[in-house]
């Protein structure tokens, strides 16, 4: 608004450091989410893969989406769904299925979430917030399908060359070609 800037706001996070899937699963009665730094990423990923098919967790998220999109900005006095300072909504920061078995339910959930966002807000763009095929268990067809949803306006990809072992921090110049090739 004031500075002629617009924001891309994500509505949830896949990762434990800001709640994410584990938060919703815990509040849906699925038990305590493992903490990656304490319990390891395999335990964390196994637990959060349940999110894709947990309807109670989805409803908690949908209630949050309804609250945020219809909330009134106390400075502009506009509902967020009408606020021109917002460019777009992202369903999440790096949403993932966390297992190949969860992919069908993951795609279904993203379609439901994007439909809800569109039904509440026709003024702003909507996106997934994805890591590309990496967020779809390296299934590029899954990524293409979720991007083709009629309620998704654009797709993005978060790239993590170090995390995905495409480049080594101490050999970046040598590994740049591999990282570049893998982004295509």
Where are the language model's segments positioned?
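Active-site mouth of glycoside hydrolases
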Residues: 1-183
């Amino acid at each position: 608004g004031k500075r002629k800037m617009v924001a891309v706001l994500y509505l949830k996070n896949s990762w434990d450091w800001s709640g994410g899937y584990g938060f919703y699963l815990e509040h849906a009665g699925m038990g305590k989410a493992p903490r990656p730094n304490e319990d390891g990423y395999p335990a964390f990923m196994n637990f959060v893969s349940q999110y894709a098919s947990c309807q109670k967790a989805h409803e908690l998220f949908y209630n949050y989406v309804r609250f945020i999109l219809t909330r009134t900005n106390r400075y502009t006095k506009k509902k967020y769904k009408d606020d021109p300072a917002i460019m777009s909504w992202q369903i999440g920061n790096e949403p993932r299925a966390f297992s190949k078995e969860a992919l069908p339910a993951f795609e279904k959930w993203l379609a439901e979430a994007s439909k809800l966002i569109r039904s509440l807000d026709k003024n702003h763009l909507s996106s997934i917030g994805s890591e590309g095929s990496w967020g779809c268990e390296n299934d590029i067809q899954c990524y293409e399908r979720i991007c083709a949803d009629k309620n998704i306006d654009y797709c993005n990809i978060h790239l993590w060359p170090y995390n995905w072992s495409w480049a080594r921090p101490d050999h970046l110049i040598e590994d740049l070609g591999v990282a570049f090739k893998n982004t295509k």
